[in-house]
Amino acid sequence: AKAELQFDDFAAPLINDKEAADEADIIARRILPAEDIIHDREKSLGADDFADFLAVTKGVYTFIGTHNPDNPDTGAAHHNGHFDIDEKAMLISCNLYVDYAIAYLNGEFNK
């Protein structure tokens, strides 16, 4: 048997800018207890086109947990027909991104 294989590289590796990650950590610590902030998340083979943005500008990609142990229906992974987000997690992510933007625009991270 013969086969031809064409491999298309669809996404660049997603690597956070260290400075932006440190800034996001400052903001996250204002919103969440330190024990709820994970810095050494296991590497993933998943892909995201956000990597294309990080190739040209400083930025940070975060994971916000959406599982509530008190509600087992929220335990399914994303892109799963049973996925049901704990809407409280949306408040955390909104606060993180809005507070980061405000701090940035107010010059808090200027060195």
Each predicted region: which residue ranges?
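Metal-dependent amide/peptide-bond hydrolase catalytic core
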Residues: A1-K111
